Amino acid sequence: MRLTKEQKVTSNQLESDRERYSAYLRSLPFTINLGSHLVVHAGVRPGVPLRRQMVTDLTEIRTMGANPSSRRGLPWYKVYRGRRIVVFGHWPSKAPRLAPRAIGLDTGCVYGGRLTGYIIESNQFVSVPARRAYAAPKR
């Protein structure tokens, strides 16, 4: 695997604590169930029960079809009709992505955009500008 310049810098910064951070990250769940909402990194495969989701669905999915990591195709959240509202990231846009049963929060902070959060109780977004761009946008 080849690391980008930014990834190499991060890797060097974390080297002394690599095992501690790795153990911590491995201990985290792939989903956070908040009752009415489900928090995931990337999304869920519509029609597949949560217990049968593949790790790659939860961490990489963007669209339906042969290459779910692709930015081209039908977005999973436009098809999803599950019981819980899915709060997800992994797909940067200028504003949160809103669908009937999904909320996308990735507003490109790593690329110099904004860091956005969502307050479930009041159905409100909170957003602050990034301090800087940490990586170049992917094309």
Show where each model-derived region lies.
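Acidic, His/Gly-rich catalytic cores of divalent-metal-dependent hydrolytic chemistry
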Residues: 48, 55-139
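Active-site neighborhood of divalent metal-dependent phosphoester bond hydrolases
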Residues: 1-38, 46, 52-72
